Amino acid sequence: MRPNTLAEAVERIQNGASQDVALAEFVDTFDLAPTSEARYATIEREPALTSDKRIDALVGAIAEYLAKQRKLGHVPHWTSAAARYLDRPWHTCAFEDDAMREYLTFSSLAEFASRNIFTEERPLRRARGPQPANR
């Protein structure tokens, strides 16, 4: 069963679930929400902070990115908290490679790069993709 909110996805991660799976399932939930209001409800509640600063920053970036890309009208206030930003750069490649790090630095979306997270240009890409929201 998919998490209903980003906060639930983080709870699952803290309880040992795979970060990649929990976040991917959350993105599916978000994309399948029938309205913009329902989508916003999935990111409105602040996820608990974890012992992993990368996850804390990543979920802030995810919520901000989804709110802006799907034109929800506003971004949850919790995404701007200092704990949602990294002090040091994090390049999300699985291996150390200067060329990959350079690529990620220049391809990262603003919502991620502003938090010192450097990832591909479509980090939340899913096969299903976003569904048109009823207005």
Which residues does each PLM region occupy?
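Charged, helix-prone or intrinsically disordered regulatory segments positioned adjacent to compact structured domains
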Residues: 1-74
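Charge-dense, extended regions
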Residues: 67-135
